Amino acid sequence: SGIIDRYHSLYRDNQIYNEAALVIDVKTGKVLAHVGNASDTSDSHGSKVDVIPAPRSYGSLLKPILYLCSLEQGILCPTSILPDYPANFGGFSPKNYNVEFDGVVPADQVLVRSLNVPSVFLLQRVGTPRFLERLRRLGFTTFTQPATHYGLSLILGGAESSLWELTGAYAGLAHRLLAPSDTVWKVSYLGGKGGTGQSRLLDASYNTSGFHP
C-alpha cells in the first residue's frame, strides 16, 4: 500500500484520486497483493471503494493483446510496416499521444511506443468482431455489446474493463509461456482464500486464449 500512496501523492495534483494494484504470481496463480485504493484518499473521492473490480476505460492496455492476435493470424511479423498518417474511419479520426505522424512504423515499434493510429489500422485488418471474440475468450465479461457498438475505438479504451480481468488476462498469457504443458491454472488468494465474485473470471484464461508459445 505504501507504493500506491506514493503514486497517489504524485498524481493527485492532476486530479487523479484513485489508485489500485493487483500483483499475481503467474507461475502459481496466487494473488500476492490486492490494494483496492490509496489509503489517504478522501471520502469524497471514494476512499473506501475497492476499484480493482470496477469497470473503467483501459486506455491502451489491449494493444499487446491485439499485437499477439495479429501475429497468431499471420497478419504481421515484428518487422511489418504499419501506416501512421491522418485518417478518418467513418467519422473516427484517431491521433497519437504526441499529435505527430511518422508515415509508416515497424510493427514492433508501434507496440513499444504505444502508437494509436497504427493500432487502429491494425484492428481494422484483424476485424473488430474477431478481436472482440478473442477478448471474451480471454475472460473479459464487460464487453457485452456487439462489435458495431465499439467500432475501432475498442483498441483505444473505447469500452470498459476491470483491473481484475486485465491482470488475469496478462497473467494467463504469461503463464502459458512459462508452463505450456499445464492444463489447470486458477487465480486465487494465498492461503486458499477465495477472491471476489470476479475471481472465477480468471480461471484457466490462458487455456481459452488460443495463443501459443
Residue ranges and their predicted role:
Residues 5, 68-75, 124, 168-175:
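Short glycine/serine- and small hydrophobic-enriched flexible loop segments
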Residues 1-61, 73, 77, 129-137, ...:
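Periplasmic/cell-envelope proteins involved in peptidoglycan metabolism and beta-lactam response
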Residues 27-28, 38-42, 57, 87-89, ...:
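Solvent-exposed loop/turn segments at secondary-structure junctions
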Residues 29, 61-70, 110, 135, ...:
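Residue-level preference for non-acidic, small/hydrophobic
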Residues 24-28, 54-59, 102-103, 107, ...:
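Secondary-structure capping and boundary motifs in well-ordered enzyme cores
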Residues 76-131, 175, 192-213:
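Conserved catalytic neighborhood of penicillin-recognizing serine enzymes
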Residues 140-207:
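Active-site-proximal helix/loop microenvironment
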Residues 20-23, 32-34, 81-83, 109, ...:
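Structural recognition of the beta-strand scaffold that forms the well-ordered cores
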